[in-house]
Design a protein with these regions (language model features):
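Positively charged, lysine/arginine-rich intrinsically disordered segments
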Residues: 6-8, 13, 20
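Active-site region of the double-stranded beta-helix
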Residues: 18-50, 56-58, 73, 80-81, ...
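Short hydrophobic/aromatic beta-strand or adjacent loop that forms the aromatic wall/cage
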Residues: 64
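Structured beta-strand/turn binding interfaces of compact recognition modules in eukaryotic regulators
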Residues: 70
Length: 191
């Protein structure tokens, strides 16, 4: 019995070490969102223009809502701190990410999705080449595993909605399209 307990502890510490995170880019005490509760987080996320009651009554599971924020607002600066291409590059450098499982590279060519993934571990030089030279979109799955800021935001949403919240980051070069036009049946946030 003692050996299995020791192995269990060792396995759990290994899994905690497996995910390495880059440095935090923003002081959490200067958050734009209110993180007191899941409700206050979601209310501050959708903004005062709509409000939570109107959102739930008129939009939730009924129709899409597009919220456009003024470029001069603190919101834009805050969102820029949540995730960036530089953060992704650092994550790729310090973690053993896998194509398909953690990250995809793709581009729309003649109305068809072209995949740039390789087999095995993600290599930063390949991602950089595909993004910069081939204008491929980077799709990064579950970024909250590597970003405490995103994890905190998603955790509050999960608490408020009492449901799991999925997250992907799509980074697409200017004048490019990574995926064909499609209709999503879930909440989508675009920055």
């Amino acid at each position: 019995m003692k050996n299995s307990n020791k192995r269990s502890k060792a396995d759990s510490s290994l899994s905690q070490e497996a995910v390495k995170k880059p440095k935090l880019l923003v002081d959490p005490s200067k958050d734009y969102l209110k993180f007191d509760t899941g409700k206050s987080t979601f209310e501050s996320f959708i903004g005062n223009e709509i409000g939570l009651e109107k959102f739930l009554a008129d939009y939730w599971e009924k129709k899409p809502l597009f919220i456009q924020r003024n470029e001069n607002e603190k919101w834009v600066e805050y969102v820029k701190t949540l995730f960036s291409l530089d953060q992704l590059k650092e994550i790729i450098k310090i973690n053993n990410l896998k194509y398909g499982q953690d990250l995809n590279l793709c581009k729309l060519v003649n109305d068809k999705k072209k995949n740039f993934n390789k087999n095995g571990s993600v290599k930063l030089d390949h991602v950089t080449k595909c993004f910069e030279k081939d204008s491929a979109t980077i799709q990064f799955h579950q970024p909250q595993r590597f970003s405490d800021q995103l994890w905190r935001l998603i955790e509050k949403f999960e608490c408020y909605f009492n449901n799991l919240v999925g997250s992907n980051i799509y980074i697409t070069p200017d004048d490019s399209q990574g995926l064909p036009v499609l209709i999503k049946t879930f909440f989508l946030y675009i920055n």
